[in-house]
A protein has these predicted regions:
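Bacterial N-terminal signal peptides that target proteins for export
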Residues: 1-8
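A short, N-terminal "cap"/entry segment at the start of jelly-roll beta-barrel domains
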Residues: 19-82, 128, 171-179
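Secreted/periplasmic proteins that engage bacterial cell-wall peptidoglycan
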Residues: 66-72, 83-108
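Short beta-strand His + acidic residue motifs that chelate non-heme Fe in jelly-roll/DSBH
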Residues: 98, 116-117, 125, 137, ...
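Ligand-binding loop in jelly-roll beta-barrel domains
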Residues: 129-130, 139-166
Length: 179
């Protein structure tokens, strides 16, 4: 039994050694390892409050239309969609990492101040939202949320996504922002 374990350990050590050597060689020569495949969040804690599927399983098309005075809302989804609600608290200096969503996302800043940046904005202009304000992300493009203030910030986030789809898709740093 110990021989197979040793063989697996040896293979793992060779693979890890090869990775270390590549990174070391790149650092020594100044060569680039390329942009990371994604960026990670830091200084935040999220709690999924709930997720539910909306639609008729026999129809597989979800439709809602509401017109009242000057107000009009319409949602159509094929196939059915999920709605998820999440609470995210960002500590001072916390950030979401670059990411995107498969559908629209409604963000309400409950307490504190949040700053949002879009990957497709070459000027990296900040969009600042404070307690009581909202931010709409239409989905499908990368963005980052940052708490650039000195106090915690709490957000309630409502996601609309295809049924059973991931709510967040990590994205590489687009390189348009100085941070």
């Amino acid at each position: 039994m110990s021989a197979p374990r040793n063989k697996a350990t040896l293979i793992l050590a060779l693979v890890l050694g090869g990775c270390d050597r590549t990174a070391t060689e790149a650092a020594a020569t100044g060569a680039s390892m390329g942009r990371p495949l994604y960026t990670v969040s830091s200084g935040s804690q999220s709690t999924l409050l709930g997720r539910a599927t909306f639609g008729d399983p026999s129809d597989r098309t979800f439709k809602v239309k509401r017109i009242s005075g000057d107000w009009h809302a319409e949602v159509k989804a094929t196939p059915n969609l999920d709605m998820a609600v999440q609470r995210i608290v960002f500590q001072p200096g916390g950030q979401s990492g670059w990411h995107r969503h498969p559908g629209p996302v409604f963000i309400q800043v409950v307490t504190g101040t949040m700053t949002f940046y879009e990957s497709d904005d070459p000027t990296c202009a900040p969009v600042v939202r404070t307690a009581g304000q909202g931010y709409l992300d239409a989905g499908e493009h990368a963005h980052i949320a940052r708490n650039e203030s000195g106090a915690p910030a709490e957000n309630i986030v409502v996601y609309l996504a295809p049924q059973a789809a991931a709510l967040r898709i990590d994205a590489p740093d687009p390189g348009n922002c100085p941070f």
